Amino acid sequence: VATSHLAPQESLKLGKFCSQQKVKHIYTHLMWAPEYSLEVGKQFIEDGGMVELTAVTFGGFVHKRKLAECVEAINTLGAKNLVLSSDTGAVRSMIPSEIFRMFSVNLSNAGVSDDDLNTMMKKNPLAMIAE
C-alpha cells in the first residue's frame, strides 16, 4: 500500500493499520512538501513501513529540494528503509529511465555508496513486490 498524497497524519494512521495487518506499505513523496517531513518519515519507518525518495523532489524537473537534503535523508533514515523512484511519466516530465539514471549518478557523486544505491533501487523495491 502506498500513501500517495494523503496528509501526513492520515499516512501515519494508514501505516500503523498496515503494520497490524502485516501488509507492506510505503510513505511516498517524502519532503515533497514541508509537512512531508523527515520526522514523519522516521515515524513511518518506526511503525514498520518503507519510505520513498523521488528524483522529482530532489533535483527533478521542479527542483523542490537540494540533492544534499536527499543525501541527509538517506544517512538519517538508512538505505535499508528507503526506495528511490523517478516519480515521472507525466507529459511534462522527463523520461523516467533518464531522470532515474541522472538521480543515481548525482547521488553517487554526492557520496552515496553503490551498495546503498543498489539497496534502494533494486533490493528494497523487489522486496516490496515479490517477498
Question: Which ranges hold each PLM region?
Answer:
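Divalent metal-coordination and catalytic microenvironments
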Residues: 1, 51, 87, 117, ...
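Divalent metal-binding pocket/active-site signature
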Residues: 1-36
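Structural preference for beta-strand elements that scaffold enzyme active sites
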Residues: 2, 24-26, 48-52, 81-83
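Catalytic metal-binding/acid-base residues of hydrolase active sites
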Residues: 6-7, 31-32, 56-57, 89, ...
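Histidine/acidic-residue-rich catalytic or RNA/ligand-binding cores of hydrolases
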Residues: 11-17, 36-44, 61-73, 90-105, ...
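Histidine/lysine/aspartate-rich catalytic loop segments that bind and position anionic ligands
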Residues: 28-50
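Short acidic/histidine-rich active-site segments
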Residues: 54, 79-96
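Mid-to-C-terminal alpha-helical segments outside catalytic/metal-binding sites
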Residues: 100-131
